[in-house]
């Protein structure tokens, strides 16, 4: 492998508009229930009732922010390691792909991935996931999600170059700790972002949103 392609996400700029989700779903003609890119809202804190004014509540450490997440095209992908038929491979540019001609639909990769990236297509009987828009990448074009982000909160490029430009943060809540799979991701944290594994908040997105 000569390089490692990666995504960049600016949590301080994301407005939770889900344009990236829609672009991904449209470009890949994904069925209902399958979203290769998901926007997850995370929040916490408390609203404390005013003891003297009924109906009045005061915020206490209230926060919320959104994460746009897809397959992380990890440097140590557990999905590939778990596949019993060798149906998941990394290209020379680090992009992780599922060979659906080999896939037997056992779903081991789904259970192994801490990001929930591989998703089972019930009708086709095989696993699916983000391809980094490899077809567009090979033409020198942007992934659909990156191109669709109106806030320019998404970017892509070689991992080393993204780290040099944006820093080396690669995990904030609610994402898992990065040392599990070494995700090819760089994040500019939201001002209220919490370190993975130490969060006091919870995912507040509705299931149908993800």
Across the structure, where does each feature detected by a protein language model lie?
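Non-ligating segments of multi-cofactor redox enzymes
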Residues: 1-210
């Amino acid at each position: 492998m000569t390089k490692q392609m990666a995504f960049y996400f600016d949590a301080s700029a994301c407005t939770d508009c889900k344009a990236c989700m829609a672009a991904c779903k449209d470009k890949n003609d994904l069925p209902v229930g399958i979203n290769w890119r998901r926007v997850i809202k995370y929040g916490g804190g408390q609203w404390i009732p005013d003891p003297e004014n009924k109906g009045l509540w005061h915020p206490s450490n209230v926060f919320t922010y959104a994460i746009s997440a897809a397959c992380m095209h990890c440097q140590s992908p557990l999905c590939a390691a778990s596949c019993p038929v060798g149906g998941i491979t990394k290209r020379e540019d680090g992009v992780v792909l599922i060979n659906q001609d080999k896939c037997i639909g056992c779903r081991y990769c789904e259970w192994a991935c801490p990001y929930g990236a591989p998703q089972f297509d019930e009708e086709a009987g095989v696993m699916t996931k983000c391809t980094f828009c490899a077809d567009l990448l090979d033409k020198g074009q942007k992934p659909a999600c990156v191109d669709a982000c109106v806030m320019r909160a998404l970017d892509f490029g070689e991992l080393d170059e993204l780290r040099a430009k944006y820093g080396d943060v690669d995990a904030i809540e609610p994402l898992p700790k990065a040392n599990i799979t070494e995700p090819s991701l760089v994040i500019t944290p939201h001002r209220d972002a919490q370190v993975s594994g130490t969060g006091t908040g919870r995912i507040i997105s509705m299931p149908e949103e993800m």
